[in-house]
Amino acid sequence: MAKPRHYIFLLAALVVFFGCSGIRFSHLSPEAQDFHPQSMAIFDIGAGGYEEAREAVDRIVTDELTAKGWFQKVLSVQAVQGLFKENEVLRKASADYLAKFNAVNFSDPELSKKISEEARIDALLLVNIDYWYYTKEEGQNVAKVGLGMRMIEAKTGALIWKAMHHLSADYRFSKPELKSVATDVVKQMVGVMPH
């Protein structure tokens, strides 16, 4: 009887070990099961001190989401900002929503619904740049990029999915481009994103 327990324990340990080989953190809300957005806006990119990376990350995330073909419409941060110029109601609702979200980590359902109606989108994607630099780790030169993403159901303001991931690329002489490391990070994160 003791042998089957050992096998069960070993099997469970292997599942845990190999099951953790994806992105570093991903949390899916129960509502995600029934949420299948047709349109998404990359609503904000929090640069966290890495302003030079904001435009590149916007392009990389937009391109990856578009390439997946999961959504009929994907709006980049630049496209959303273009809508702000045309629509004062959307601009004000968005500014108020982001101020509240950033100040108290609260997704206001009324403001989110207003944004959904004005921009005609189903989901908001908020992106944070956590790392974007070259450094030395354990004596090795590395290019390091880390991102966080949160998907919000625009009509209700519900947090559907959040994830964090980072990758490091070792190098000796020639530095890898941070954009290419970021592309790998985004591909892995989008790969586990609900759709």
What are these regions (language model features)?
Residues 36-48, 93-94:
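Acidic/histidine-rich, surface-exposed loop or edge segments in extracytoplasmic proteins
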Residues 20-41, 59, 106-107, 111-122, ...:
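C-terminal/domain-edge helix-coil "capping" segments
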Residues 128-133:
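Generic short beta-strand segments
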